[in-house]
Amino acid sequence: AVVGGGPAGIAAAYFLAREGAAVTIFEKEEKAGGVIRYVIPGFRIGDAAIDKDISFIQKMGVEIRTNTEITSVADLKAQGYDAVILAIGAGKPGTLKLEKGETVNALKFLRDFKANDGKLNIGKNVVVIGGGNTAMDTARAAKRTEGVEHVYLVYRRTKRYMPAAEDELLEVLEEGVEFKELLSPVSLDGGRLLCKKMKLGQMDASGRAGVTETADVVEVPADTVIVAVGEKIDTD
């Protein structure tokens, strides 16, 4: 049994089926595909790509049960499955608490963006906080959202230390997203995101330069602030 019908679950099912195992995928959504179908914007990868992979593994004999949420591995074992692979994805949002004002989670925004073809009411000025690939997708999607005029990518280190792939960042900049480095968000008030100016310090355990606060405060226009600071696996 494979729990989760996203890219990891589909890949696991493929390799297991190739070795002769009888595989069943359990997917809680209406269709398999995971983040590719429901979160990653169509300008990155279309549904046709994941549909092709799904069709391929089904022809190999993989069974896919949709609209089926699994809450107990023991129940699957009791049904006769010899092994269970959890491929549920990192869908638990990372959080960033501001002293004042509310933020929007990047995964929720991307899901809403895709479901509504970019027709969302998020104002003219959008700030995306984060430096990973999810932040890049979010910034590009925000730039394509109806009514948005300016998108600012706020990161507390410099470009050099961003975890996002270099080509991802280049695409973001080419599409007109404005990059604001060495800023740490503090509060959102009256259409302005107040940020502490940071400075690079000593290298930390991650191999990147650490950062420390300065006394300077920078304001960034913001009707909506979207947080993309790292997703986690929901082990609950």
What are these regions (language model features)?
Residues 1, 22, 124-125, 150:
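Residues that mark the start of a beta-strand
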Residues 1-25, 134-143:
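N-terminal Rossmann-like FAD-binding beta1-loop-alpha1 element of flavoenzymes
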Residues 8, 30-31, 91, 134, ...:
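Conserved Rossmann-like nucleotide-cofactor binding loop
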Residues 13-15, 37-38, 96-100, 139-141, ...:
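Short amphipathic alpha-helical segments
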Residues 19-37, 151-160:
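Glycine-rich FAD pyrophosphate-binding loop
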Residues 39-44:
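Short glycine-enriched, charge-decorated loop/helix-capping segments at active-site entrances
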Residues 48-94, 108-122, 144-236:
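A Rossmann-like FAD-binding core segment of flavoenzymes
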